């Protein structure tokens, strides 16, 4: 087969796929004139608690969302004892300097469709589905009838102005407070299904699609209420599995506000809320046949067939994922601008956010985070490439909403958070894929960054080294590599009063002292952090360099 014919066939296939994708979207959404109305409802993490509109400018992908979106209609009732009401339709914008997920949702959806959109929002912190949102016997703040009245009055105003509309989707984020009532917790799944059923009845929309936001496991409650949170998630998943018009929206990979003291928090805060909204937007767009994922294929094969390849496994939590390192900041960092470009000489495979985003096989190394973010893999790969000869492949497995006990072979009672089997399967798959392409693979090591949240809570901090040791030992057994090197990097642990008595650094150092293939990397000279736990762009770059240099010193 000639090269010209292969190129022609590839072009025809590409055009066919593009046409088919466009056709599917048109078939599902033939009307670009009708106003599409979305309902947002829930408790504090739907309100946007502990966020600040003035902070949006800090996060490059979301700059400008503090300004009104004049083409998006907004009707709301937000708060508790004294609700903050729009009293009709207004332009979409932050309410009382608070950032809700509707801001980024609206911009993302508006960028992808021609139809006008509108948002109706009712949210109130500290409320329960079992009481406040109960459609049959509402109590407390009686939010079900209040929200129904808000929706009906908002739609009546559209009718009065003869604006054609359709209710397009219902975004729901709630459940934290139900876990503290045994009856509400046990019945959350049944209550949620009843909630969906009653909305479809009362809004006369039998095919209304619901998007159910996950309770974020990165929060304080994700740690000290693991079992309670698991029970609520199980209820959510029961509904989204049994109801074909309900979709579970993962959020545990989203940013979490940095609290005082040790840094842990209950709320997403500004960045997390903006990412939260993108999650809903992407899910809705998939529903109507629009996939915003950008393909990142190799232009040419990164290394010759049959050539040896060193495989580096990167693993960890918030900073290995790159929660607050933005590609948009690279142009400001002299000497690092090129990291924003794909490196066609290094193969990269990833499974990040606990499977929220997975690469399409092997791609060129480059920024591939969730929201214009990246991790230490970029500078790690660049440093290795400049200092060591040979072919390089990097496979990254992370979940920023996990803790170190989620990575142990034993796992925890929150079974949907047990990562060890997936982690080992990911490593084996990475090796197998490279070997299937004719490469001779050497597993150079596992490069793991210690869980940031684990060092910020006493019970976790005390067990961190023990959990890590269990994971290291079992990985060597399951990969049949008794001498497998683990490079364990650690940033300075939080120094809140009461935590200092648990010397997590010494505990990890003791593991290294007893194991010649366990290298403890004390990354204590990184650029100063803006807040506890999370490292920003410049620090993530330095972390990658520090890890790479440690490998070069110990290879």
Range-by-range predicted roles:
Residues 21-25:
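Sec/Tat signal peptide C-region and signal peptidase I cleavage site
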Residues 10-20:
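Bacterial N-terminal signal peptides
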């Amino acid at each position: 087969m000639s090269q010209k014919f292969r190129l022609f066939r590839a072009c025809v296939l590409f055009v066919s796929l593009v046409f088919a994708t466009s056709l599917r979207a048109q078939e599902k959404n033939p009307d670009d004139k009708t106003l599409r109305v979305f309902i947002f409802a829930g408790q504090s993490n739907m309100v946007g608690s502990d966020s600040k509109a003035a902070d949006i400018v800090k996060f490059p992908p979301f700059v400008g969302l503090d300004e009104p979106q004049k083409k998006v209609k907004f009707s709301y009732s937000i708060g508790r004892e004294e609700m903050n009401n729009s009293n009709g339709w207004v332009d979409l914008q932050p309410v009382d300097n608070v950032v809700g997920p509707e801001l980024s949702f609206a911009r993302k959806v508006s960028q992808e469709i021609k139809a006008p959109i509108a948002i109706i929002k009712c949210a109130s912190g500290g409320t329960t589905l079992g009481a406040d949102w109960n459609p049959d016997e509402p109590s407390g703040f009686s939010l079900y009838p209040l929200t129904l009245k808000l929706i009906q009055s908002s739609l009546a105003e559209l009718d009065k102005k003869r604006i054609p509309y359709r209710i397009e989707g219902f975004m729901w984020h709630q459940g934290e407070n139900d876990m503290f009532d045994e009856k509400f917790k046990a019945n959350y799944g049944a209550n949620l299904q009843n909630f969906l059923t009653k909305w479809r009845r009362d809004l006369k929309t039998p095919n209304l699609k619901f998007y159910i936001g996950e309770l974020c496991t990165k929060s304080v409650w994700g740690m000290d209420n693991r079992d309670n949170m698991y029970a609520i998630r199980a209820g959510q998943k029961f509904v989204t599995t049994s109801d074909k018009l309900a979709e579970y929206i993962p959020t545990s990979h989203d940013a979490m506000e940095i609290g005082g003291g040790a840094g842990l928090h209950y709320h997403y805060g500004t960045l997390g809320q903006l990412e939260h909204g993108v999650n809903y937007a992407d899910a809705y767009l998939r529903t109507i046949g629009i996939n915003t994922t950008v393909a990142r294929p190799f232009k040419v094969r990164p290394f010759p067939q049959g050539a040896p390849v060193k495989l580096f496994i990167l693993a960890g939590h918030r900073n290995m994922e790159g929660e607050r390192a933005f590609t948009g900041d690279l142009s400001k960092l002299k000497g690092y601008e090129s990291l924003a470009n794909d490196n066609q000489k290094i193969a990269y495979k990833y499974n990040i956010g606990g499977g929220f985003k997975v690469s399409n096989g092997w791609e060129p190394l480059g920024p591939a985070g969730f929201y214009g973010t990246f991790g230490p893999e970029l500078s790690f790969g660049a440093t290795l490439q400049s200092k060591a000869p040979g072919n390089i492949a990097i496979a990254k497995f992370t979940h920023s909403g996990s803790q170190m006990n989620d990575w142990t072979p034993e796992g925890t009672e929150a079974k949907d958070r047990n990562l060890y089997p997936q982690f080992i399967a990911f490593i084996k798959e990475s090796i197998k894929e490279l070997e299937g392409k004719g490469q001779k693979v050497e597993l150079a090591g596992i490069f793991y960054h210690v869980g940031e949240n684990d060092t910020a809570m006493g019970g976790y901090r005390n067990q961190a080294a023990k959990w890590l040791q269990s994971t290291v030992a079992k990985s060597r057994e399951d990969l049949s590599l008794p001498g497998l090197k683990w490079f364990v990097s650690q940033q300075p642990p939080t120094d809140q009063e009461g935590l200092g008595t648990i010397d997590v650094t010494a505990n990890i150092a003791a593991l290294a002292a007893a194991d010649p293939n366990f290298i403890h990397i004390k990354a204590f000279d990184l650029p100063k952090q803006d807040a506890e736990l999370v490292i920003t762009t410049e620090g993530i770059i330095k972390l990658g360099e520090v890890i790479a240099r440690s490998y070069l010193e110990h290879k």
